[in-house]
């Protein structure tokens, strides 16, 4: 039985940890996850999914602000390998060097493409038709370590980032376990990343503002890429309206203002983009309200009027 220290925080992390926990070839001797966050709406402490699972299964866990602070604790465990999945914190080289087989990392992109903290968002924003799960060795440089194996998959054109996340969460645990067993049993070899790297860094606040000057394909990719979180937005009458679903309608023969509402129906709010391309907004969130289909909104009181403009 191989001893593992697991580093992770997200829902994806929890799903991977869960399958590792139930696999008879592994012993989870400790888990390292991010410190609890505070929900600013109700001021309550919110543990990560990973911490909740550890409490449920009585697994030893640590929540350091910096991983190096628990070096002595981890050293005592004499684990065979570290496994990192969406940990969200820099791992010091001294921590990596504690493990005879170093620390491996599951990264949901076809490395060296989309190194960084938001590869799923940028897969959709870039309109990629294919992607991959990559198991790599953790090194000092971000997501630049040698690759053990990659598992390719097709990206559905209708997926938003939430849909892609569901796919990754369903397929990552078994792939990670397969690779971990191969690595520990020395059945295979590492290979260096080939090609020019690109980056999928965390989405900045200013990037959440959707750009009406884009062509419709890029605009729709941004809508899907920011959905369901953080949600891309447009300004209307001084309020930020989040857009969660939209589709292309047609190119208009008339000259419209950028962002102009050209039609409102149960099917959606049609607005003009650059070059008079018309898209239909189908799912939105007005400040203070829940996310709703446009068909729900137009039955009641709403601020949208043909001729007015989103910005």
Curated annotation (Swiss-Prot):
Gene3D superfamilies, alphabetically?
A: Formyl transferase, C-terminal domain, Formyl transferase, N-terminal domain
Going by the entry's taxonomy, the superkingdom of the source organism is recorded as Bacteria
Q: Which reaction does it catalyse?
A: L-methionyl-tRNA(fMet) + (6R)-10-formyltetrahydrofolate = N-formyl-L-methionyl-tRNA(fMet) + (6S)-5,6,7,8-tetrahydrofolate + H(+)
Q: Where does (6S)-5,6,7,8-tetrahydrofolate bind?
A: 109-112
UniProt EC number? 2.1.2.9
Q: Which GO terms describe its molecular function?
A: methionyl-tRNA formyltransferase activity
Q: What class of enzyme is it?
A: transferase
One GO biological process term: conversion of methionyl-tRNA to N-formyl-methionyl-tRNA
What does the entry list under GO cellular component?
cytosol
The keyword 4Fe-4S is assigned to this record: no
Which family would the database say this protein is a member of?
A: Belongs to the Fmt family.
What PANTHER family does the entry give?
METHIONYL-TRNA FORMYLTRANSFERASE (PTHR11138), METHIONYL-TRNA FORMYLTRANSFERASE, MITOCHONDRIAL (PTHR11138:SF5)
The task this protein performs is described as: Attaches a formyl group to the free amino group of methionyl-tRNA(fMet). The formyl group appears to play a dual role in the initiator identity of N-formylmethionyl-tRNA by promoting its recognition by IF2 and preventing the misappropriation of this tRNA by the elongation apparatus.
Entry protein name: Methionyl-tRNA formyltransferase
Q: Which organism is it from?
A: Mycoplasma genitalium (strain ATCC 33530 / DSM 19775 / NCTC 10195 / G37)
For this protein's source organism, the top of the classification is: Bacteria, Bacillati, Mycoplasmatota, Mycoplasmoidales, Mycoplasmoidaceae
């Amino acid at each position: 039985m191989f001893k593992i220290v697991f580093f992770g925080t997200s829902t994806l992390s929890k799903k991977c940890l869960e399958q590792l926990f139930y696999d008879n070839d592994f012993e989870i001797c400790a888990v390292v996850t991010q410190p609890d966050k505070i929900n600013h709406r109700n001021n309550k402490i919110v543990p990560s999914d990973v911490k909740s699972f550890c409490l449920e299964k009585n697994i030893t866990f640590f929540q350091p602000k910096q991983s190096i602070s628990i070096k002595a604790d981890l050293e005592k465990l004499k684990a065979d390998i570290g496994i990192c999945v969406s940990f969200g914190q820099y791992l010091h080289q001294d921590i990596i060097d504690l493990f005879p087989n170093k620390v491996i990392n599951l990264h949901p992109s076809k490395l060296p493409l989309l190194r960084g903290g938001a590869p799923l968002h940028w897969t959709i924003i870039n309109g990629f038709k294919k992607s991959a799960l990559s198991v790599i060795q953790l090194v000092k440089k971000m997501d630049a370590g040698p690759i053990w194996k990659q598992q390719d998959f097709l990206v559905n054109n209708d997926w938003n980032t939430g849909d892609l996340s569901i796919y990754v969460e369903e397929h990552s645990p078994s792939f990670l376990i397969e690779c971990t067993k191969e690595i520990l049993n020395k059945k295979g070899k590492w290979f260096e990343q080939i090609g020019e790297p690109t980056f999928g860094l965390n989405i900045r606040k200013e990037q959440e503002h959707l750009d009406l000057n884009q062509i419709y394909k890029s605009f729709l990719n941004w809508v899907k890429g920011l959905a369901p979180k953080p949600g891309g937005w447009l300004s209307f009458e001084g309020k930020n309206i989040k857009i969660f679903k939209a589709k292309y309608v047609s190119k208009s023969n008339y000259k419209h203002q950028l962002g102009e509402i050209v039609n409102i129906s149960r099917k959606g709010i049609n607005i003009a983009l650059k070059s008079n391309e018309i898209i239909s907004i189908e799912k939105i969130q007005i400040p203070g309200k829940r996310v709703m289909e446009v068909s729900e909104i137009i039955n009641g009181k709403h601020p949208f009027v043909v001729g007015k403009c989103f910005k």
